[in-house]
Amino acid sequence: GDKLEDEIFNATHILLSIPPDSAGDPIFKQYGDIIVRSKNLKWLGYLSTTGVYGDHKGNWVNEKTKVNPTTVRGKRRVLAEKQWLSLAKDHRAPVNIFRLAGIYGQGRGPFSKILAGAAKRIIKENQVFSRIHVEDIAQVLLASVNRPGVGQIYNVCDDLPAPPEDLSLIHISEPTRP
């Protein structure tokens, strides 16, 4: 095999964040069989999205809520999740799925989007989104690495859903400028 295949085969921990395509996760397709044969793998994390749940009209969801994606992106994430979870089910691979809410933190806040020309206003009555800070994501991943599961799914979000027009996170999303 090539060098990347050798690295994957010998890896103890793998974190996957590549967006899936219409066939699911490209890493699963290309390297899933190598990952299954690995004797060293202690933990595999797949970063997904809470978008797999679809629109629940402001109602709360949890890891047991049935997925019902309404976007192409969400449907592709569900397919990728199923691919990775099949390794956990069929081979007891230490796969963990992390469904991330809207990410905020340095370089990811509203000002960054405005400066990049990518800002969007989404204002719908009673529409709320969960969010998660980048540092909190890192803490969740580290906790999982230290206590790996098999086929676990985690919603990674704060417990403070807010409307998208809520700008209260700006002060912690962007550095103070002189």
Segments the model singles out, each with a brief description of its role:
Residues 32-72:
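Conserved Rossmann-fold NAD(P)-dependent oxidoreductase catalytic core, especially the SDR/UDP-sugar
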Residues 57-97, 122:
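Catalytic helix-loop patch of NAD(P)-dependent Rossmann-fold dehydrogenases
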Residues 69-74, 101-103, 124-132:
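Glycine-rich "substrate-gating" loop/helix at the edge of Rossmann-like oxidoreductase active sites
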Residues 78, 91-93, 103-117, 135, ...:
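Glycine/proline-rich active-site loop of Rossmann-fold NAD(P)-dependent oxidoreductases
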Residues 168-178:
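Residue-level detector of conserved catalytic or cofactor/ligand-binding positions
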